[in-house]
Design a protein with these regions (language model features):
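Flexible, low-complexity linker/hinge segments
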Residues: 12-21, 141-160
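Conserved pre-ATP/AMP-binding loop-to-beta segment of ANL
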Residues: 147-165, 172, 195-201
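Conserved AMP-binding/adenylate-forming
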Residues: 19, 45, 60-105
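Conserved ATP-dependent adenylate/AMP-binding module captured primarily in the ANL superfamily
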Residues: 88, 99, 103-132, 147, ...
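Conserved AMP-binding/adenylation subdomain of ANL enzymes
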Residues: 184-201, 208-273
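Gly/Ser/Thr-rich phosphate-binding loop
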Residues: 247-251, 259-322
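N-lobe entry segment of adenylate-forming
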Residues: 1-47, 51-66, 70
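Conserved AMP-binding A3 loop
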Residues: 48-50, 161-185
Length: 326
């Protein structure tokens, strides 16, 4: 089965990539491999890979200054903005456990999570200062950053890196614990796709609190030296498609349906340079695959218990096997 995925990728590009077992080592890799390429952008500010990793290292400096015990649970409640993207990397790179929180949580839910997971603290975006005013843990602005860089923590692939909340598949939400090796294996699995995979353009449509969005929609894109645009509002993110002209989108079937309906109304020009949609986290209707083909877009379908396995399989032969997930 490994050959199915390896054989679909440009072999020259595949030679430049390798499985990296921890987030600190991954940061060193992308800094060296893609230094001057653009990494993340909110359409106003764009950071290269060199700048991104430098800023992550400065955030590690701030985290280290807090004097927390290594392996502490640290949450982030923020929009899908540049700060959240940096904190997603900085917290595990500092040797702590990242918990990305869904934006819809109310004050009671946040208080309960703080106590249940023994949070050492929470980085909070400006939009969430009111709802976090009484949480029983320390809070820091999501903009917090040090003035100088610090070395990344020395962690192993089995060191806990993050906790993601499950959806409805397994009943009541619970925390799925992921090691560095788990996060990075999923991120490496996410690089595979048909044809050229390096230096593409994406919009981070799915929240970083959703592991499919975090792994497939962000980490795997860093792995390939691609440019990822922030998406702090889903409606605005969809409207950005003809503006930033992503080549690839990582979506769930519900979002694919919305985008297809808009394209039917406005025409193919709305989709810009879009050529590939990676779709998962729920069953993908064969009808959507057929409609994407009509717009000249390949829709690759995947499905797995994403909170627990983060990236399990994908179907890049939807024309031949539309019902298959392999």
């Amino acid at each position: 089965m490994n050959h199915y995925f390896y054989n679909m990728v440009n072999p020259d590009e595949m030679e430049t990539l390798e499985y990296i077992p921890t987030i600190p080592k991954f940061l060193d890799f992308i800094r060296k491999q893609y230094s001057d390429y653009p990494a993340i952008s909110d359409k106003v500010t764009t950071y290269t890979y060199e700048e991104l990793v430098s800023r992550v290292a400065k955030r590690v400096t701030f985290i280290n200054s807090l004097g927390l015990e290594k392996g502490s649970n640290i949450a982030v409640l923020a929009k899908n903005d540049l700060d959240a993207m940096e904190l997603f990397l900085a917290i595990p790179a500092a040797g702590h456990v990242l918990i990305m929180l869904p934006n819809a949580l109310n004050d009671k839910a946040l208080a309960g999570i703080s106590m249940k997971f023994d949070l050492a603290g929470m980085f909070v975006g400006k939009e969430f200062t009111e709802v976090t005013a009484n949480v029983p843990c320390k809070t820091w602005p999501s903009t917090s950053i040090g003035e100088t860089e610090s070395a990344f923590a020395d962690v192993e692939k089995d060191t806990t890196a993050a906790i993601f909340f499950t959806g409805g598949t397994t009943g009541a939400p619970k925390g799925a614990v992921h090691s560095h090796g788990s996060i990075m294996r999923g991120s490496f699995n996410g690089v595979f796709g048909p044809g050229s995979i390096l230096h593409k353009r994406y919009i981070a449509m799915l929240p970083l609190s959703h592991i499919f969005g975090a792994i497939m929609g962000y980490m795997a894109k860093l792995y390939t030296g691609s440019l990822t645009f922030t998406c702090t509002d889903m409606r605005a993110g969809i409207g950005d498609i003809p503006v930033v002209r992503p080549t690839t989108l990582v979506l769930v079937p519900g979002l694919v349906e919305i985008i297809l309906n808009i394209a039917k109304a406005k025409g193919r020009a709305f989709l810009g340079d879009l050529e590939l949609i990676m779709c998962g986290a729920a069953p993908v209707p064969p009808r959507q695959m057929a409609e994407c083909r009509e717009f000249g877009i390949t829709l690759c379908a995947g499905y797995g218990l994403t909170e627990c396995a983060n990236l399990t399989s994908g179907n890049c032969d939807t024309d031949k096997k539309p019902e298959s997930m392999v």
